[in-house]
Amino acid sequence: MTKPYVRLDKNDAAVLLVDHQAGLLSLVRDIEPDKFKNNVLALGDLAKYFNLPTILTTSFETGPNGPLVPELKAQFPDTPYIARPGNINAWDNEDFVKAVKATGKKQLIIAGVVTEVCVAFPALSAIEEGFDVFVVTDASGTFNEITRHSAWDRLSQAGAQLMTWFGVACELHRDWRNDIEGLATLFSNHIPDYRNLMTSYDTLTKQK
């Protein structure tokens, strides 16, 4: 049976950035590295733009997974940061789950590396506990397309909604009249073609 449309609500959503670590990022091959980095930072920017509670977590930083990428540390200097000693599934870490539940939000926007493990495991666990889960596919990465689609199939069959960061931003925003300049600036910073669109729009507007 098809699940009813559950719309993202900026007043009931939190962002979970899972295991965007230097070592793990070297494994991402299903999307170009520069595009992937841009998408992750775009998700971070939209989380800040909409004032969404955001949680960072890493696993086994002292091992080959490596440290959290510095760009995310700089983007979120004061956000909860859970360095898991070894738990593969972030939901198995008590501090992480406490931080998630402390947000008071029921909609979880999740992205991470690698998709079929670091994203899928906590997403499936959260669904089991009654959360609505939205997986940001283009801010999550893995080894290859086969692995990616296997993860997406498992997640969607369990009830997760698969989205892109652009779709997340638009659904949270709801109405262009809320703040066209602010959201358009966010898009322009991460989508070159959108920057061209806004440049054209600004030029035409000034001519009127």
Curated annotation (Swiss-Prot):
Q: Which Pfam families match?
A: Isochorismatase (PF00857)
Q: Identify which residues the record assigns to the active site.
A: 118
Gene3D superfamilies (UniProt xref): Isochorismatase-like
The yes or no answer to whether the keyword Hydrolase is present is yes
- Example of a GO cellular component annotation carried by this entry: membrane
Q: Which UniProt keywords apply?
A: Hydrolase, Lyase
Q: Could you state a single Gene Ontology molecular function term?
A: lyase activity
**Enzyme Commission no:** 4.-.-.-
Output the InterPro entries linked to this UniProt entry.
Answer: Hydrolase_YcaC-like, Isochorismatase-like_dom, Isochorismatase-like_sf, YcaC
Q: How does it assemble?
A: Homooctamer composed of two tetrameric rings.
Q: What is this protein called?
A: Probable hydrolase YcaC
UniProt lists the gene as ycaC
